[in-house]
Amino acid sequence: NGVSPAAGYFGTISRAKYSAVAGSGSVTTPTTPTTPTTPTTPVAAGSGLTVALAGDTAAAGLFGESFASRPFTKINFTASADGDITVKSVTIERTGQAQDSVFSGIIVLDETGTRIGTSKTLNSNHQAVLNEPFTVKAGTTRGMTLAGDSDNNQDAYAGQIATLSLIAVDAGSATVNGTLPIVGNGMTVNSTLA
């Protein structure tokens, strides 16, 4: 055909190149845009948490052998109305005239009596830090109970009186209001009650 690279000629080589670049010529139908949604507003953390001994805290009683989740001290945790409060940890101290070994573990119970997290043993300062977080919704109160577990032999401690005290609360940036320690009623160790 006598045409060498001539300007304006659209031959087989040009058509092949065009087809490779332009594609097969199929038409893509655009998708229908979705309706925008309103973004969720994050819940602000509350500014204050009030802690106080609950009026229905456990009465003085007995603490026998192989007890699990024996209620000692019920604490009301009340969040300010301006936001939810997450309690990151509570520090409990064994007080009273009992030895630490009266307890095989210390635990927090929620309003239904369900154990929150794993029980902890007392350290050399007679304290246990329970760091399973729980939330108190804005403007509400949760009654949480400090409870104790015992082993199967309390013979060496019979007659001793133990109490569990709330001595510290970590509520993050929220101010904790209330007079600490908060102490419940004494429980008398009994080696014949199981």
Predicted regions located by residue number:
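A short amphipathic alpha-helical interaction element
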Residues: 1-6, 14-22
